């Protein structure tokens, strides 16, 4: 994402959601002994550390101060060999784009097979005015394509993949070591409790409807999501996420992070 496009998106998104109290990123720092984050304006990049391995979750904007802030955490960009990508929006892949400073040129990207279709130009987002017409993203990193329900290992770190289409067709959520759920933009919290991000930016809201109406445990998930968000009208994202694997609801710890 070019610097000009980055600045446009940052300003446009801030204007669109003014008053919603929806952008509440965590400040740069360690959240616990395993998870840290870097704040980039209204977004977060997350890091999961286990032993000598540090895995990055999403790549944020094309952000000038990323290396500096990683230094605050004691993380050398050269030590990042694995990056989990939830989806290819330009505020999630900016640091691995071809026109980025190249901090992570040697890192392997893990991305859903469906979401990868955006990267290679097979799929495009709907255009609403101009804002949601995503530019073609060029990435040269090695990629491993993932599928719903896939479980794989990175240096002793267990990663389970859940496909949650709606925000994008191939949005992927990652459950790491059966303890940490990295949701990308599946769950947003606003001033009114929960915010239906799917209904505002979804390519096809029918996807969300299918997720919350079909399958065993769907009604339980709807009720559970409503209790989290307090307002049924704003609970779509929570219902969507929980219906991915309703029999394992105890694993879906809701954290107040925006991106």
State what each model feature region is:
Residues 2-6, 10-13:
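Eukaryotic low-complexity, intrinsically disordered regulatory regions enriched
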Residues 14-18, 24-26, 30-31, 113-165, 169-257, ...:
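Metallo-beta-lactamase
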Residues 21-73, 173-190:
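Conserved beta-strand hairpin/beta-sheet module of binuclear metal-dependent hydrolase folds
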Residues 34, 48, 58, 87, ...:
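Divalent metal-coordination and catalytic microenvironments
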Residues 55-58, 79-84, 161-163:
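Short catalytic-loop micro-motif centered on adjacent basic/acidic residues
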Residues 63-65, 71-150, 251-257:
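Active-site HxH/HxHxD metal-binding segment of metal-dependent hydrolases
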């Amino acid at each position: 994402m070019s610097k000009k496009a980055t600045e446009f998106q940052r300003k446009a998104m801030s204007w669109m959601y003014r008053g919603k109290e929806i952008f509440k990123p965590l400040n740069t720092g360690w959240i616990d002994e395993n998870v840290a984050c870097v704040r980039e304006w209204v977004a977060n990049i997350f890091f999961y550390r286990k032993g000598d391995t540090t895995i990055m979750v999403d790549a944020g904007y094309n952000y000038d101060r990323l290396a500096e802030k990683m230094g605050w955490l004691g993380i050398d960009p050269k030590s990042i060999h694995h990056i989990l990508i939830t989806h290819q929006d330009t505020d999630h892949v900016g640091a691995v784009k071809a026109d980025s400073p190249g901090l992570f040129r040697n890192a392997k990207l893990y991305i859903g097979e469906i979401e990868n279709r955006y990267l290679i130009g097979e799929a495009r987002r709907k255009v609403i005015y101009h804002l949601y017409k995503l530019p073609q993203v060029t990435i040269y990193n090695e990629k491993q394509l993932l599928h719903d329900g896939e479980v794989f290992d990175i240096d002793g770190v267990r990663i389970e993949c859940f496909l949650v289409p709606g925000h994008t067709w191939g949005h992927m959520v990652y459950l790491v070591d059966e303890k940490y759920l990295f949701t990308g933009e599946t769950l947003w919290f606003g001033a009114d409790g929960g915010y239906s991000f799917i209904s505002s930016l979804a390519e096809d809201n029918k996807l969300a409807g299918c997720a919350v109406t079909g399958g065993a445990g769907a009604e339980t998930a709807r009720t559970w999501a409503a209790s989290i968000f307090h307002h049924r009208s704003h609970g779509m994202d929570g219902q969507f996420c929980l219906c991915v694997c309703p029999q394992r609801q105890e694993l879906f710890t809701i954290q107040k992070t925006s991106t």
